[in-house]
Amino acid sequence: MLITGESGAGKTENTKKVITYFAILGAVESKKKDGDPPEEKKANLEDRIVNTNPILESYGNAKTIRNDNSSRFGKFIRIYFNQMGKLAGGFIDVYLLEKSRVTYQQPNERGYHIFFQLVEEGPVPGLQEMIRMSTDPYDYFFMSQGKVKVDSIDDQEELEFTDQAFDTLGFSETEKFDAFKTTALIMHLGEMTFKQKGREESCEMDDPLPGQKSCELCGIENWQLFYGNFIRPKIKVGTEWVYKGQNADNCLNAIAALARSMYNRLFMWLVDLCNRTLIDPTMKKVNFIGVLDIAGFEIFEFNTFEQICINFCNEKLQQFFNHHMFVLEQEEYVREGIEWEMVDFGMDLEATIQLMEKPMGLLAILEEETLFPKSTDKSFEDKLKENLLGKSPVFLKKQPGSKDKSAHFAIAHYAGIVNYNLSDWLTKNIDRLNDTVVDQLKKADNALVVYLFRDHPGQPEEEAKKEKGKKGKDAGAKQFKTVSSAFRAQLESLLATLNATDPHFIRCLVPNNHKTPGLLDSALVMHQLTCNGVLEGIRICRRGFPNRTVYLEFKHRFVIIKPKEVHACGTDLKAATKVILESIEDANDRWRLGH
């Protein structure tokens, strides 16, 4: 099941209902076929599948302008069944968590729900003392740039649900509290400040307390060195290692990059632990029902890196949908013996997909510029226009009338032309971490923090011992993994799975932007029907023969057109239908007769 739609259209709620239904159905089948024994175990598996939602929502959902509980990531959930139809487990894949929301929120938006749950006192005794956080969200910069309270959300109650979900899923006390402590650590990192010295590339710590709290939570004794590693990281110049002074802005940028990376790694760790609890090794997995919950096509006033990833994903999904319709149409026409020149509708979107995927396409250029140390937004823009403008029919100059006056280019997608702004794409595609700080974190006493950064190479000289005996090429290949390359690999894996299944498409629509029941904004709905591919599907159907009627029904309905001729056909329904259709002028190319 592919569930798509705009933010606030109901994707997450529909996904939860679908998952709950299949989980309960699988448990009922277990009880029917097994009788009384191990009912408790199977009910627990059902509960675990359902209870992944509070954790994923706490760490992956946030308030946006349009939706108080918006999923800021995509997910593909598999519900497994054995040969008897019994529930046999589950597995969750996640896509493209919005890391930038960790450190920045627009006005009237909010950070991830878990941040605001942790400042609530009561549901988890002693939590504030353990994580060293106050109960005032305004004490923390990373969570107070937008709104801090949402009328429709009771953060205290939600913390209780999150805590219970950890227990239901079988997280140990250590795992649960390590997750809370690491989340709090990220908030404390946001409070670290620096004072600029007289010289341009030099600064010093301002208030030592946030750094001390951060070090306490991650198990680092030398908090002065922790600050010092931001202020004067070790870098390689030629063949020599030197300490390079940083100005205050550089230090703050390094902290923000560390916070985003740490939160993303924490989120992926939580998903891995959820998957661990959903596996029942005693059950043989034969079939699965997959539910894909992912953002639909987005055309905003300001479109940036997140939108290009989401829209590329939707181009691929729409191509899959179009090709699927083509295959179904072809099968139907072959079954009915209808002669028709077949067109693979999936090829209609090929120009845009080629723009993204070809060897010197947009994604390849983004990868190249991301990994080149001296690249800038301007050099990236210049290279895109040099290689794509005028050479691809769908890569365009920014379109007039855009409210984003700083847009750099436009792409003609199936849902419409979208203007894109290139600002910060290189930064968003890879968070360049301060390797000196990461090396210190990898030696911390907090086992979870060490685990989260286990695959980060750190300083090359620190890794030299581990990499001894390996070829330099192999050792260096793992240094950087960009968001776009990881997302592209995930997307290819997802499409391979979808191509091996029998897909069903669910399109969710926002009826109006006022959250008012019973009100339908026709212009808004039409825009969404365009963006989620419904109109594209109608266009495809109209290129074939979209209306299918059985002969008996057609004869009874239209006999009035040629009553004598139809009655002369007797019981031959196909002949009667042909008589009626041939009497209509200039319509012979618009109908066919099946078996």
Residue ranges and their predicted role:
Residues 8-9, 170-172, 297-304:
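A generic structural motif
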